């Protein structure tokens, strides 16, 4: 499963707090955190988080999850993630899903992981879309549904997630959740390989051995079109 992504949080922070009357205090914490002064960030954000400031809650969760300026405390991270997630912050929902998925700071619970992944995935978080695809693919915390797995893999793949691109290739190769299609399998393996996913190039070449030259050319053309359109024209 995917881990927690700090860069996403820092980029979104100011947008969420621009209209807050406490934005100045939040900004002090943000500047401190960006310079590595998490002690000051904690001092600025904790009162805001206690008052319900959602991004202060989210960033506190990150600090406790990663041990930035505080003793690492997964249970405390879960507490703050949950508060932010319940206010609809997609990144918090996704990260809370990871905590439940891995049993980190909370009892492991596949159904809860699915619940939070779904909420985040529906808001467009690529890692949550991928993770939800995995849950459907494996029948973990939800009834196994290959077509639903393909749906979520596809959404994550179209955001550039190489693991999802590879997994769609495998689904097309096996005809799992989709009609079997070596051209599409080759296409997605090729895209995943171009994005650095280990073994995708090997699997692409293995399936190419079963294809005609015309089909290989078609798959390569589809891959180029998909990537050049920033995954908007992937067939």
List each model region and its residues.
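Terminal, low-structured helical/coil segments at or just beyond the last alpha-helical repeat
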Residues: 198-235
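Positively charged n-region of N-terminal signal peptides that target proteins for export
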Residues: 1-7
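Hydrophobic face of amphipathic alpha-helices that form TPR/SEL1-like repeat modules
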Residues: 25-32, 44-48, 59-66, 95-102, ...
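N-terminal leader/linker segments that initiate helical-solenoid repeat arrays
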Residues: 16-44, 55
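Bacterial N-terminal signal peptides
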Residues: 7-17
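Short helix-capping/linker turns of helical repeat alpha-solenoids
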Residues: 19, 36-37, 50-53, 66-68, ...
